[in-house]
Amino acid sequence: MDTATPSAEAILRTAAGRARAAMRSLAAMPAARRDGALRAAAAELRIHAVNILAANARDLDSFEGPPAMRDRLLLNEARIEAIAAGIDAIADLPDPLAGSLAEWTRPNGLVIRRVPQPLGVIGMIYESRPNVGADAAAICIKSGNAVILRGGSESYHSNTAIYLAMTKGLRQAGFPDGTVQIAPNIDRAFVAAMLGASGQIDLIIPRGGKSLVERVQREARVPVLAHAEGLNHTYIHAEADAEMARTVLANAKMRRTGICGATETLLIDAAIAPALLPRLIEDLAALGCGFRADDRARAIVPSLPAAGPADFDTEWLDAMLSVSVVDDLDAALDHIARHGSSHTEAIVTENADAAARFLAGTDSAVAMWNASTQFCDGGEFGFGAEIGIATGRIHARGPIGPAQLTTFRYHVVGTGQVRP
């Protein structure tokens, strides 16, 4: 009797086959049934909150990373409720598979409709945050996709507990077992198997640190929807409202320092810097923020530590802010072009023309005017949650919700036409 442990490739092939079968059912399923299953999954998360917290405690006990990463890993009752509420919100969204995207009639009478369609089988590779698996599963179900999850080893017990609770709800709703699956262990070979699963997985979405995303992009034989680091800037224009600038910047940097939507660099116009920069520094220092500043900023606030060569290319994910004084809007745009990651950029100004130039001049997935960069979030965009923030140009950009996990095809309706 052969008792050999199946290889990662064999496990992945089995999972992908089950996912493909489930996806075919999901694509044809009425929206009300998909939404009902999501609500059942959310209910089970609430019911099993104690088990999820116990699993999370096991992960936290063995975690040895920095405080910012520990905060990403941490679950509590409020965060579990937020996950469940996000799933309920996804269920309440319009059906991304409903209706036609476009329709037209050709001179020969053929009616052509462009209709939405699920992408297929999604592979989700993520680190640290246990909520990512729940969000990804919910967004995939809403959009008619099946998903295979592979979370980080540091959150293995939390991820598994969330998966078990959600799939209990899905089974109660009569969903195929292959709808949502999770890697059965923390074997890194499973990641390699996912990346090489051309023809089995239709899209890989990495969500995590720069090294993870770069590895996926480098090794994948499957299309990748990349989520780059958040080297986000808040630019205080010469015509900014000072009190608004103070409020927006404090939130953009310090609300949650460990998320990809946090501001990592302050750019401030030289015309307003002498009066406003000391107040901004004082506000942030009182909240526990540290700084790395260029020479022009240090000339105004001498106590600021000097920035090193790499500091303006660093995603801090912590209570640290790079600071630069720039000549004007053009200089700010130039700085962003050299150091940004195409994630989120914000301007604070009362000048509508300057704001319009900034919004058009930044090559970021999200550009903001008089708002905190931390609004770059699927929930805040009305998507219920997000599966990531796409910073590339294909297939979608910005927060990825259910509608962004669809493609389209064509339905052609005739009355017996033949082509001459």
From Swiss-Prot:
It comes from Acidiphilium cryptum (strain JF-5). GO terms for molecular function: glutamate-5-semialdehyde dehydrogenase activity; NADP binding. Its EC number is 1.2.1.41. Keywords: Amino-acid biosynthesis, Cytoplasm, NADP, Oxidoreductase, Proline biosynthesis. The gene is proA. CDD domains: ALDH_F18-19_ProA-GPR (cd07079). Catalyzes the NADPH-dependent reduction of L-glutamate 5-phosphate into L-glutamate 5-semialdehyde and phosphate. The product spontaneously undergoes cyclization to form 1-pyrroline-5-carboxylate. This is Gamma-glutamyl phosphate reductase. Coiled coil: none annotated. GO terms for biological process: L-proline biosynthetic process. InterPro entries: Ald_DH/histidinol_DH, Ald_DH_C, Ald_DH_N, Aldehyde_DH_dom, G-glutamylP_reductase_CS, Glu-5-SA_DH, GPR_dom. Pathway: Amino-acid biosynthesis; L-proline biosynthesis; L-glutamate 5-semialdehyde from L-glutamate: step 2/2. Its main location: cytoplasm. Belongs to the gamma-glutamyl phosphate reductase family. It holds the Pfam family Aldedh.
